[in-house]
Amino acid sequence: MLSNFCDNGLTDKNTIHSYLPVYEMLFAPKRLTATDILEIGIGPIPHQNGGSIRMWHSYFNNADIHACDIIHINDVHRCIVDVPRIHLYTSTDAYTYALTVNTFLMKNIQFDIVLDDGPHTLPSMVAFINLYLPLLKYDGILAIEDVQDITWINDLRAVTPDELKPFIEVYDRRSVKGRYDDIIFVINKYKRSLHLAV
């Protein structure tokens, strides 16, 4: 279970939010086969962050875990610094074309999962889809968490390529813990790959 690897003191994904059951369902089929996972957002609180990065590292034990954040490396919890298979890109704006090209595209890195837990603004979420959807494997999963307003789903759907619109999933968890932003937007290319295989 994903919750077995979650340190609630270092991530809010299982405390004020209720994301772990969704991620367990989405990511379990990829647990042993995933090779590259990306999360934008290590955490804003100095030295009380990195919990989700460590959780992915333990859960996907055959994958390299990539994490981007604008915070300085000195503010990152030591539990994920200089750890094999964890690649940190700090003091970095992840929402730029230059970063995606120079850091990932030119190195032929494609992701099984890309997860946006960044500034939680609509422009950053739109940029995330535009920049990182092309870096997904044919059966990859894109997830944006902490969608601040349910009406933003329409905007995120609008920038999703038409051929992937049938594989959009929205997980509205607001009623679970009373969090206004407990919403995850997903483009599930893994489901598309299963559909094409039939």
Predicted regions and their residues:
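A short alpha-helical cap/connector motif
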Residues: 1-115, 119-144, 148-198
